[in-house]
Amino acid sequence: MSKRYAVVSIGTNSTRSLLADVAVENPRVEAARSIGTRIGEGLGESGRLGDEPMQRTLDAIAQLARAIRGHYVRLFVVATSALRRAENAEEFAERVRTLLGVPLRVLTGEEEATASYRGALTAFGALRGERVGVLDTGGGSTEYAAGSTLRPDNVVSCEIGAVRLTEGVPDLAGRDGAVPAEAVARAREIAREALKPLAEQEAVERLAFVGGTATTAGYILKGQRTPVLSYPLTREDLQRTLDRLLQAKLDDRKRIVGLKPQRADILPAGIIILD
């Protein structure tokens, strides 16, 4: 018997929906969609969610909810880094409740890391039995979890993401042309400092990347726009992709096959964090 659950997830850069049948042994994803909403735009400077980012996120939530309405037995709405930090998070949460009739749950960094880890291991069942690390680079934070079963034994959340790093080093966006070497060096130093907790982690047999930065790098390397699942990425792959982005101005980045235009300004920051 089918038992479909739906989730709407509000990230710093994107809002996503997922519909899955959880009645089977291995949950089966039946529909998934992502819309670039960037609710975290300007949050680092003001400490608040802006009116325009909130409204476009609410519009996206309504659009995603319409597409899956009637196909699930229960709907969950969650949010991550931007809502953890925003002074007016409760105001936005109330607007979501009014829109959907469902409470918004703001995940802690540790809960987010655990969810990314379990999702990755469920999708890539062949990884089970090894000690695996899962690194999820988002728009506002970066999560890491490791373990050898579906329950991670170590989770870390770091306060850095692709949107936050780009806003901290605006030249990374490429609006004025190629990114200066000084800006890249500054971004690497910021990332290195924020990610210090990861340097202390126990070695793993395999490291899996999840999130928009890693999947977009895979799209670009394969030269395609269709979904990439379980695509191997080496440090050389990441560096080659980063070099290409850093040398291109923003308008030219938007024409790269596999790169969604709304992610063109923040992808270099995301790759710097991954690397």
Task: Label each region the model flagged.
Residues 11-13, 71, 98, 138-140:
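Short flexible coil/turn linkers enriched for glycine and charged/polar residues
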